[in-house]
From Swiss-Prot:
GO terms for molecular function: GTP binding; GTPase activity; translation elongation factor activity. Catalyzes the GTP-dependent ribosomal translocation step during translation elongation. During this step, the ribosome changes from the pre-translocational (PRE) to the post-translocational (POST) state as the newly formed A-site-bound peptidyl-tRNA and P-site-bound deacylated tRNA move to the P and E sites, respectively. Catalyzes the coordinated movement of the two tRNA molecules, the mRNA and conformational changes in the ribosome. One of its GO terms (biological process) is ribosome disassembly. GTP binds at residues 17-24, 81-85, 135-138. Residues 8-283 form the tr-type G domain. This is Elongation factor G 1.
């Protein structure tokens, strides 16, 4: 099948912003103007095409990133709508990973809001070129110029307005195009679909001239040939200006700024024009790098149909009609439906059942997907988010998507017996969709523990269990996984003897127990001389100790980081057995652990808080009050980064506390670092609580 749309006319873009800046509304309008929908879905009526999960329509926020395809002129645009809430940063990360460019939507009243900072930094991390769209120009308090200066000051970006608004609030009726130096005014009756071009209004001519000069000066500074022309006083042609804006945008030297009001249908067509004119096609960005699955050598895959096939799975979704959908971004080559591919990350073969082009929540079946495109595949059994798909004879592993470790865990239990079976299956399904959500069973209590990125994240998961899977569940309080260890060397005896008529039991050992370096784990050394304990019984002693160490002597937490040497013992010709030595081993462990000055260990988290200068003192004071140790501070893009080591037990509710202490402008990441001894006073409290 021939290509319908050439690669250079394909755009893979994301729409990113803070909650409520108008992301989903903007996407809806794009779909309306590109002729995909005939009726506009309003978010506040709960009918937006992109927000198709029930919770999204209720809460009016976007949780999963739906991928949609539309055409504008002779270009094809694949749009990924991303959520703006901090607990769903994982969704944003994974969509940015597979995009070529992005539209950052800002609210003309709120300007740069906290989540805009987070999302902007994520886009910097993946080197995604962006256009800024200052939305809601019709709102009371709308201020385009303040929005632009906030992008400069808060995001440390280089915003270059290529449009100016004509009017603001209820008088907002058009924009000045600074490239062509014309005014574009919308006709209200046509839902903003029609507009006419006229001369720039007299009261704006001076301002427009000033901003036109600024724009030309900025783009010339990145292009020597233009600089010469500009300094020589020559006029630049419209095409030269456009090409220069495009090059500087793709090189992330500037961020063009345009404005409009999606809700009032103003400026959306200009936004589409800008996407096509200034954002990169798959050909304009560097070829994707990966490693050869066999040799580990670095290889490149260029965006071309003739290259070997390579794609990255960036999202798994359960669809009520077709089952599991796997969204893939094809970087090179061609994939046909019904063909076999190789998942190089897992080392498994997969068959592609069907290929679908997604439109928010409608789907169109396609026969093949080509380089640079995004599609959903049905029928993949092993593939999860971040896996690479390729042919078996040209294996490559593309750089995967990094997922943060979950930081909050709660126990969950089914309300009824009937819910019990469904709970396990449903949780596994949800975990396959969302890599930042984990499920495990606590060995000691038998409880199911779910962990995720934050309180809202887990709330939505529990909510989805009820709605999609009809499972009723009770959830507990968040909890910490403690450990125990020993601090001095001891030698003890373990003796298990039962001899009262008939076959008896006889196991007898002497062990030495000593602490190991943190993180070394458990080590067993056989130091028996002269066969005082026969060979065949030695593994049984080891097994007995391993079984006993799962429940420590202090508070029943697993015991870690110690070494046991089996040094002596005795046996009985008839009565000795593996069982007897296993019991002797576990008895010896219990006695040794109690004598070797046992202590409690707690997980210490490495916490990084990105905080605006003015809240720094409060944040540091708060971390200190949580038994935290400040490890360092550094300035980064208009904010301070504070790194600290803090016990996990002190971090519950931190997201909420941090949000209120900094008006939501700080963000934090938390990853497990190591286990450390709990201070005596705290340890006594914990033990008392457990023994209750």
């Amino acid at each position: 099948m021939a290509r319908l749309v050439p690669l250079e006319k394909t755009r893979n873009i994301g729409i990113m912003a803070h909650i409520d800046a108008g992301k989903t509304t903007t996407t809806e309008r794009i779909l309306y103007y590109t002729g995909v929908t005939h009726k506009i879905g309003e978010v506040h009526e709960g009918a937006a095409t992109m927000d198709w999960m029930e919770q999204e329509q209720e809460r009016g926020i976007t949780i999963t990133s739906a991928a949609t395809t539309c055409n504008w002129g002779d270009h094809r645009i694949n749009i990924i709508d991303t959520p703006g809430h901090v607990d769903f940063t994982i969704e944003v990360e994974r969509s940015l990973r597979v995009l070529d460019g992005a539209v950052a939507v800002f609210c003309s009243v709120g300007g740069v809001e906290p989540q805009s900072e987070t999302v902007w930094r994520q886009a910097d991390k993946y080197g995604v070129p962006r256009i800024a769209f200052v939305n809601k120009m019709d709102r009371v308090g709308a201020d385009f110029f303040r929005g632009v200066s906030m992008i400069r000051d808060r995001l440390k970006a280089n915003p270059v307005p290529i449009q100016l608004p004509i009017g603001a609030e209820d008088t907002f009726k058009g924009v000045v195009d600074l490239v062509e130096m014309k005014a574009i005014v919308w006709d209200e009756e046509s839902l903003g679909a029609k507009f006419h071009v006229e001369e720039i209004p007299a009261d704006l001519q001076e301002l427009a001239q000033e901003y036109h000069e600024k724009m030309v000066e900025e783009i010339s500074s990145h292009d020597d040939a233009l600089m010469e022309k500009y300094l020589g006083g020559e006029e630049l042609t419209v095409d030269e200006v456009r090409a220069a804006i495009r090059n500087a945008t793709i090189a992330i030297q500037i961020c063009p700024v345009i404005c409009g009001s999606s809700f009032k249908n103003k400026g959306v067509q200009n936004l589409l024009d800008s996407v096509v004119e200034y954002l990169p096609s798959p050909v304009d960005i560097p070829a994707i790098k990966g490693v050869d699955a066999d040799s580990g050598a670095e290889i490149e895959r260029k965006a071309a149909d003739s290259e070997p096939f390579a794609a990255l799975a960036f999202k798994i979704m359960t669809d009520p009609f077709v089952g599991q959908l796997c969204f893939i971004r094809v970087y090179s080559g061609v994939l046909n439906s019904g063909s076999y591919v190789y998942n190089s990350t897992k080392g498994k073969k997969e068959r592609i059942g069907r290929l679908l082009k997604m439109h928010a929540n409608k789907r169109e079946e396609i026969k093949e997907v080509l380089a640079g495109d995004i599609a959903a595949a049905v029928g993949l059994k092993y593939t999860t988010t971040g896996d690479t798909l390729c042919p078996e004879d040209a294996p490559v592993i593309l750089e995967s998507i990094e997922f943060p470790e979950p930081v909050i865990a709660i126990a969950i239990e089914p309300k009824t017996k009937a819910d019990q079976e469904k709970l396990g299956i449903s949780l596994q399904k949800l975990a396959s969709e969302d890599p930042s959500f984990r499920v495990r069973t606590d060995e000691e209590t038998g409880q199911t523990i779910i962990s995720g990125m934050g309180e809202l994240h887990l709330e939505i998961i529990v909510d989805r269990l009820m709605r999609e899977f009809k499972v009723e569940a009770n959830v507990g309080k968040p909890q910490v996984a403690y450990r125990e260890t020993v601090t001095k060397k001891v030698k003890v005896e373990g003796k298990f003897v039962r001899q009262s008529g008939g076959r008896g039991q006889y196991g007898h050992v002497w062990i030495e127990m000593e602490p190991q370096e943190p993180g070394k784990g458990y080590e067993f050394v056989d130091a028996i001389k002269g066969g005082v304990v026969p060979r065949e019984y030695i593994p049984a002693v080891d097994k007995g100790i391993q079984e006993a160490m799962d429940t420590g002597v202090l508070a029943g937490f697993p015991c870690v980081d110690f070494k046991v040497s089996l040094v002596d013992g005795s046996y009985h010709e008839v009565d000795s057995s593996e069982m007897a030595f296993k019991i002797a081993g576990s008895m010896a462990f219990k006695e040794a652990a109690a004598k070797a000055s046992p202590v409690l260990l707690e997980p210490i988290m490495s916490v990084e808080v990105v905080v605006p200068e003015e809240y720094m003192g409060d944040v540091i004071g708060d971390l200190n009050s949580r038994r935290g140790r400040i490890m360092g501070m550094e300035g980064r893009a208009g904010a301070q980064v504070v790194s600290a080591m803090v016990p996990l037990a002190q971090m519950f509710g931190y997201a909420t506390d941090l949000r209120s202490a900094t008006q939501g402008r700080a963000t934090y990441t938390m990853t497990f670092d190591h286990y450390e001894q709990v201070p005596k006073s705290v340890s006594e409290e914990i033990i008392a609580k457990v023994k209750g």
